[in-house]
Swiss-Prot record:
This is SOSS complex subunit B2. It comes from the Eukaryota. Residues 181-196 have a biased composition (Polar residues). GO terms for cellular component: SOSS complex. Gene3D superfamilies: Nucleic acid-binding proteins (2.40.50.140). One of its GO terms (molecular function) is DNA binding. Keywords: DNA damage, DNA repair, DNA-binding, Nucleus. The gene is NABP1. Belongs to the SOSS-B family. SOSS-B2 subfamily. It is found in: Nucleus.
C-alpha cells in the first residue's frame, strides 16, 4: 500500500489485495467495451511501465477518454483477481490523471495479468465477492478522471486533440501504427473519403 504522496509503485510490485495504490503507466491498448447488467460500460486497458504490463478495468465515461499513448497517474487504486488474472481498479475515490503522452520507457513483458498459479488460492477466496462487488456496487470502480487543462497550461485530453490523429500504438510489437481519429472508439471504422477532383454527382446522371 502506498499513499498519494508516495513515489509511484512499479507494476512488478503490485499484488492482489493491495489498496491505495499510486501507479504511473502508459496506455498500450484499449479493450472492447462490455456492459454490466445495470448498463455501465467497462473497458479493460493494457497498461505498462518499465517493469512490465498489467490490465486495468476502467468504467463508464473515463474509459471513453483514455487513448493509447496516454501517460496516466492512478491514485487510490487497488489490485484484485478477476477471472484468474491480476487486475487494477480505480477504486472508490480513486483517480486517473493524464500527465503526458508517448514519452515513457515501458516493457510489455512480463504481463502480470496473465494467469499465475501463485494467485489461485487468493482467487478462489475472493473471486465470488469480487464479482458480486463489481456488478452490485460499481461505485468502487468508477473513480474520477482528469483529462482537462493541466497546471502548466498545456491542454490534454480529448478537447486538445482537435483534428490531429491520436496515437494508436502497436498491439503486438509487429504491426504498424494505425492512426485513429479523435472521438472514435476502437471498434468503430473510420471512413475516409478520397476525391479525384471530379464531382461525384456527375457520375450518377443518366
Amino acid at each position: 500500500m502506498n499513499g498519494v504522496r508516495d513515489p509511484p509503485l512499479f507494476i512488478k510490485d503490485i499484488k492482489p489485495g493491495l489498496k491505495n495504490l499510486n501507479v504511473v503507466f502508459i496506455v498500450l491498448e484499449i479493450g472492447r467495451v462490455t456492459k454490466t447488467k445495470d448498463g455501465h460500460e467497462v473497458r479493460s486497458c493494457k497498461v505498462a511501465d518499465k517493469t512490465g504490463s498489467i490490465t486495468i478495468s476502467v468504467w463508464d465515461e473515463i474509459g471513453g477518454l483514455i487513448q493509447p499513448g496516454d501517460i496516466i497517474r492512478l491514485t487510490r487504486g487497488y489490485a484484485s483477481m478477476w477471472k484468474g488474472c491480476l487486475t487494477l481498479y480505480t477504486g472508490r475515490g480513486g483517480e486517473l490523471q493524464k500527465i503526458g503522452e508517448f514519452c515513457m520507457v515501458y516493457s510489455e513483458l512480463p504481463n502480470f495479468s496473465e494467469p499465475n498459479p501463485d494467485y489461485r488460492g487468493q482467487q478462489n477466496k475472493g473471486a465470488h465477492n469480487e464479482q458480486k462487488n463489481n456488478s452490485m456496487n460499481n461505485s468502487n470502480n468508477v473513480g474520477t478522471g482528469t483529462f482537462g487543462p493541466m497546471g502548466n497550461g498545456v491542454q490534454t485530453g480529448a478537447e486538445a486533440r482537435g483534428c490531429q490523429f491520436s496515437y494508436a500504438g502497436r498491439s503486438n510489437g509487429r504491426g504498424p501504427i494505425n492512426p485513429q481519429l479523435p472521438g472514435t472508439a476502437n471498434n468503430q471504422t473510420v471512413m475516409t473519403t478520397i476525391s479525384n477532383g471530379r464531382d461525384p454527382r456527375r457520375a450518377f446522371k443518366r
